[in-house]
């Protein structure tokens, strides 16, 4: 055991001495030469730059499919305004379903309006007690 400790100590001392010898040479001083003003910035080659731009480009919104399914690619502001007018009685009734104040998700039905939700919870509680 004492022999292993002695070998380890000799190894560490020899590495320390060799590191000091290398550190004394100025030829191996890499970090002092890293200034941007002295180096010429190389432009990326055109195909490589084009490839990076394609990778970094954001996908179009039509490419996303969420939990609610695929969205219409041609939905526009005018269609949304017409739908809102139809829902609130300012136009003809649309063929799309009516939006209500509740949301049916994976965790069950939830109200978007907190006051209405609290009222419905209290009504459900009263019905269960009877």
Swiss-Prot record:
Protein name (database record): Protachykinin-1
Record PANTHER family: PROTACHYKININ-1, TACHYKININ
GO cellular component, one term: neuronal cell body
Annotated site location: Cleavage: 59-60, 63-67
Entry's localization field: Secreted
Function of the molecule: Tachykinins are active peptides which excite neurons, evoke behavioral responses, are potent vasodilators and secretagogues, and contract (directly or indirectly) many smooth muscles.
Gene Ontology process terms (BP): cellular response to nerve growth factor stimulus; chemical synaptic transmission; inflammatory response; neuropeptide signaling pathway; positive regulation of cytosolic calcium ion concentration; response to pain; sensory perception of pain; tachykinin receptor signaling pathway
Annotated keywords: Amidation, Cleavage on pair of basic residues, Neuropeptide, Neurotransmitter, Secreted, Signal
Gene Ontology MF: a single term: substance P receptor binding
Methionine amide: residues bearing it: 68, 107
Family named by the database record: Belongs to the tachykinin family.
Signal peptide: 1-19
